[in-house]
């Protein structure tokens, strides 16, 4: 998505479709099998002026693989959720959100909708509350109870849901977790 914004912003492209999808094969009768959600989503980034306009962005690179699948494996594997939460999510997400808010000259209270992705439904709520967001008024639902863990499609699904509720001209925070954060 950031590359699409760059290409459209530079004038080299007028419209770019960005798509993501995931189907996670998990061990039978495992928590991963019960919580996995197959999904796909797409957004169009264009120069027509009717869509998103990025005001600020940040990236934090952190090679921590909470979930993975080897080429030779049939199913995804992952570290225990608490390990991923402490060593991955809690280290990078507050940093990237803080950088974006600072660059935009905004505070949590200024954000209309906050899309905060995460590897489980509780982490985004705890993070948002800790950073001063109104969890019931600003934070976008993670859709875990409806769609499950949609993996790579989660950021675009949540962005689409937030855009449906956002007021024109309002600020939207979009924070994505995976091998760091953006």
Feature locations, PLM:
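Short, flexible active-site loop motifs that bind/organize anionic cofactors or intermediates
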Residues: 83, 101, 145
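Phosphate/pyrophosphate-binding loops at sites that engage ATP/ADP/AMP, CoA/4′-phosphopantetheine
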Residues: 94-112, 131
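General beta-strand structural signal in soluble alpha/beta enzymes
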Residues: 18, 53-56, 116, 139-140
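Structural alpha/beta core scaffold segments of enzyme domains
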Residues: 6-19, 23-25, 43-49, 98, ...
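Membrane-targeting and insertion segments and their boundary/processing signals
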Residues: 14-15, 63, 67-74, 129-130, ...
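General structural feature for long, well-ordered alpha-helical segments within catalytic domains
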Residues: 15, 40, 85, 89-96, ...
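Claisen-condensing/thiolase-fold acyl-transfer catalytic domains that form or cleave C-C bonds
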Residues: 1-12, 32-35, 112-182
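Condensing-enzyme catalytic core mediating Claisen C-C bond formation in acyl metabolism
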Residues: 24, 28-94, 98, 177-182
């Amino acid at each position: 998505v950031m590359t699409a914004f760059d290409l459209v912003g530079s004038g080299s492209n007028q419209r770019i479709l960005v798509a993501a999808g995931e189907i996670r094969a998990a061990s039978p009768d495992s928590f991963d099998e019960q919580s996995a959600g197959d999904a796909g989503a797409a957004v169009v980034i264009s120069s027509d002026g009717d869509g998103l306009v990025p005001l600020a962005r940040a990236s934090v690179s952190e090679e921590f693989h909470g979930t993975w699948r080897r080429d030779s494996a049939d199913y995804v594997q992952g570290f225990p959720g608490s390990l991923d939460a402490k060593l991955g999510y809690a280290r990078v997400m507050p940093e990237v959100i803080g950088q974006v808010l600072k660059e935009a000259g905004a505070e949590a209270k200024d954000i209309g909708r906050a899309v905060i992705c995460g590897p489980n439904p509780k982490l985004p709520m705890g993070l948002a509350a800790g950073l001063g967001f109104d969890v019931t008024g600003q934070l976008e639902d993670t859709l875990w109870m409806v769609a499950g863990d949609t993996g790579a499609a989660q950021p675009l699904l949540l962005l689409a849901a937030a855009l449906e509720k956002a007021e024109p001209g309002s600020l939207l925070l979009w924070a994505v977790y995976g091998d760091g954060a953006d």
